Design a protein with these regions (language model features):
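Positively charged n-region of N-terminal signal peptides that target proteins for export
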Residues: 1-6
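Bacterial N-terminal signal peptides
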Residues: 9-18
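Sec/Tat signal peptide C-region and signal peptidase I cleavage site
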Residues: 19-23
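Transmembrane beta-barrel domains of Gram-negative outer membranes and organellar outer membranes
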Residues: 24-156, 163-167, 172-183, 187-191, ...
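A contiguous binding-surface segment within folded domains or other stable secondary-structure elements
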Residues: 195-228
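Positively charged, low-complexity, intrinsically disordered RNA-binding extensions
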Residues: 234
Length: 297
């Protein structure tokens, strides 16, 4: 009888204490859920490119982004050239995300038969909440190789003369759900320059922005200002304006630009197109992504 009373007492004690323990667990769970979370800015731009320039976005880890970029001839070619549609230049590129912060890319352009490769690293990422960071900051380094046949093959030519390098610090902010602005101080180094009056190292200041119009439509613009006395007087600053159209796994970018080249060395230091003279090209970029490696849970 005494043992029975002992068991009953233990049972009553357990039933009385259990709700308190579970209530404490639930309270602790609620407190943990209420801890401030870090919210990172997403979709500052639809793709890793604004138009010609790199954007604040990187390709996701394990994702391969195939880009086809196309530029037609100048609109001032008139009806005989079908306002530029008879002529075209193209770049095909592959970008791959290695980590959340690092991506690499390669490409080949018909302009000067250029091969290019680059590395793009996200140093800081805009965030709010538990950890606040007002800006996204990215470092970009690229190399371009001109593979045209030598103009004067009989003289001594050096492989290094084919190379040019670009370094950029890209920083910007997504101010609202629809508006993003970024700046791109840039240095382009050319091993070979056309004349002794030009500089091997060219400094340019770029600015780009995006305004979202609808859920799947946005307008983009970018401009590069090359500081004076670095390149030939007949060269022009690059200005491009266009639209992003998102359709499932594809992003179409339709734009007008005074630049033919689609790598930094070309559209920053070798651009001859003039908006005032109608030397404007219609073009498009198409982006298609493929998941090569599934993200870890």
């Amino acid at each position: 009888m005494k043992n029975l009373r002992k068991y009953l007492l233990l049972l009553v004690t357990f039933l009385a204490v259990s709700p308190t323990v579970f209530a404490q667990d639930d309270l602790l769970s609620l407190i943990e859920d209420e801890k401030p979370q870090t919210d990172f800015a997403k979709a500052s731009f639809k793709t890793t490119r604004v138009i010609n320039s790199q954007s604040l976005e990187n390709t996701a880890p394990g994702v391969l982004d195939m880009k086809i970029s196309h530029r037609f001839g100048p609109l001032n070619g008139g009806a005989y050239e079908l306002f530029g549609l008879d002529a075209a230049t193209i770049r095909i590129g592959l970008d791959y995300g290695i980590t959340d912060h690092l991506m690499v890319g390669v490409g080949r352009s018909s302009v000067q038969k250029t091969y290019d490769g680059f590395l793009k690293m996200k140093l800081l990422r805009q965030s709010s909440g538990a950890r606040t960071m007002p800006l996204t900051v990215i470092w970009f380094s690229g190399m371009a190789l001109n593979s045209l046949k030598w103009q004067f093959p009989e003289r001594n030519n050096f492989f290094s003369s084919r190379l040019a390098y670009t370094h950029q610090l890209i920083f910007g902010r997504k101010f609202t759900e629809g508006f993003t602005l970024q700046f791109m101080p840039t240095v382009v180094h050319r091993n070979l320059i056309p004349t002794s009056q030009e500089k091997h190292d060219v400094i340019a200041l770029g600015v780009a922005g995006r305004q979202k119009l609808t859920r799947r439509l946005a307008v983009n613009a970018e401009y590069y200002y090359v500081l004076p006395n670095q390149i030939a007087d007949n060269l022009r600053n690059s200005l491009s304006i266009g639209f992003d159209i998102e359709t499932g796994g594809h992003v179409f970018q339709l734009h007008f630009t005074n630049s033919t080249a689609m790598v930094e060395k070309g559209f920053i230091t070798e651009n001859t197109g003039s908006w005032e003279k109608g030397d404007i090209r219609f073009g498009f970029n198409i982006s298609r992504v493929f998941t090569i490696r599934q993200p870890k849970d």
